[in-house]
């Protein structure tokens, strides 16, 4: 397709005039995905998926490969930025009622699950202490599945313990899943433009729209510049800020770390898992903490789409955000009082948002009718 057709297509794409900066994070996620695929490819060229050589190959990339340190740090910090952007993107969808576009919301949730799986497999690849033990703890949750659990776990591991076959298949999955993410992203964008973007007021934008290019392209470029600046500053000045000190030691199955935890972007789900003192219950809560956002389009009872004019729902929304942060913080702490009590309370409040949302919507409808 000639370039001028692509420019015309973007130029003629009608977008609401009043969409705010919160709508920029979709394009930020696309930029993060391109960055991750590019840096990931160059890292995969030098990486060795072998339990004896994986840790050494990471050191080789960092020390001997030209600009290998930059690719590795950019890839690791890029993953954190990816999750920051996706969590903001989801929060915006919850606040402004974007979930009412059901097909887009469902494809987006599928994308989130695929992204989380990809990031989890990537965290295992350096074969450090925390990589090994996080893989052991999380994959071991499959044994909680009644009847099939043990067989599923052995099938996933490729043996009776995490070993060479596990690392090889995790590397294969980590390499192939980003291409599935690209396909799902294309579907997500296609489904979005079938109906069009929402706006902060939650009203129909058909009467007041402007071309995507040049207005929104420049707006997106501004945030993209800020994102890249933040990424490069972190990569060059604080490259290990997101790393766990335990992961600088090679995986040792005979020594258990004092406190096993995954990367920060999984801590909210891990905190919910840990707060339930039952293996099956914890595993179900972990899955529910992510899948529950799929229920949002079906539990929306408010006559107004956005939370802009719904103060009660706003209060619950910001409670959800602070709860998310509280669970993330509590999950970094040891399994002992008062952290367990904090995790359990915060987990209850987290799920309460999704249960109370339809009730609050109904109450707000009643209040609006009386005014």
UniProtKB/Swiss-Prot annotation:
Q: What name appears for this protein in its UniProt entry?
A: Cytochrome b
InterPro entries assigned: Cyt_b/b6_C (IPR005798), Cyt_b/b6_C_sf (IPR036150), Cyt_b/b6_N (IPR005797), Cytb/b6-like_sf (IPR027387), Cytochrome_b (IPR030689), Cytochrome_b_C_euk/bac (IPR048260), Cytochrome_b_N_euk/bac (IPR048259), Di-haem_cyt_TM (IPR016174)
Its main subcellular localisation, reduced to a broad class, is: mitochondrion
Instruction: Specify which residues bind heme b b566 according to the UniProt entry for this protein.
Output: 89, 188
Membrane-topology annotation of the record? Multi-pass membrane protein
**Which of this chain's residues are annotated to bind heme b b562?**
75, 174
Domain of life according to the entry: Eukaryota
What does the Swiss-Prot or TrEMBL cofactor note state?
Binds 2 heme b groups non-covalently.
Question: What species was this sequence derived from?
Answer: Casarea dussumieri
């Amino acid at each position: 397709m000639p370039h001028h057709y692509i420019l015309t297509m973007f130029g003629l794409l009608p977008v609401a005039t009043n969409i705010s900066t919160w709508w920029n994070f979709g394009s930020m996620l696309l930029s993060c995905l391109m960055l991750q695929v590019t840096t990931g490819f160059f890292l995969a060229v030098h990486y060795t998926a072998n339990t004896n050589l994986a840790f050494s190959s990471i050191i080789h990339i960092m020390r001997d490969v030209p600009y290998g340190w930059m690719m590795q740090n950019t890839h690791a910090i890029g993953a954190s930025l990816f999750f920051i952007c996706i969590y903001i993107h989801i929060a915006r969808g919850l606040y402004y009622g974007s979930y009412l576009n059901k097909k887009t919301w469902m494809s987006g949730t599928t994308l989130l699950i695929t992204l989380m799986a990809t990031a989890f497999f990537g965290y295992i690849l350096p074969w450090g202490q925390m990589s090994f033990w996080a893989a052991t703890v999380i994959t071991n949750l499959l044994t909680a599945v009644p009847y099939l659990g043990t067989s599923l776990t052995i099938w996933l591991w490729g043996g009776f313990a995490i070993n060479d076959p596990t690392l090889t298949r995790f590397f294969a999955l980590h390499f192939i899943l980003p291409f599935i993410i690209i396909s799902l992203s294309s579907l997500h964008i296609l489904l979005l433009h079938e109906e069009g973007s929402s706006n902060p007021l939650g009203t129909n934008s058909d009467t007041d729209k402007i071309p995507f290019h040049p207005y929104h392209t420049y707006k997106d470029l501004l945030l993209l510049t800020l994102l890249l600046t933040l990424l490069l500053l972190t990569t060059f000045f604080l490259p290990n800020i997101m790393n766990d000190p335990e992961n600088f030691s090679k995986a040792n199955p005979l020594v258990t770390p004092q406190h096993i935890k995954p990367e920060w972007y999984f801590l909210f789900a891990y905190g919910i898992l840990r707060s339930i003192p039952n293996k099956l219950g914890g595993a179900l809560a972990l899955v529910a903490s992510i899948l529950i956002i799929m229920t949002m389009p079906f539990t929306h009872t408010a006559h107004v789409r956005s939370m802009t004019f719904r103060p009660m729902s706003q209060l619950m929304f910001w409670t959800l955000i602070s709860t998310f942060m509280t669970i993330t913080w509590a999950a970094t702490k040891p399994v002992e009082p008062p952290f367990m009590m904090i995790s359990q309370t915060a987990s209850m409040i987290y799920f309460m948002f999704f249960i109370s949302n339809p009730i609050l919507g109904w109450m707000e409808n009643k209040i609006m009718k009386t005014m």
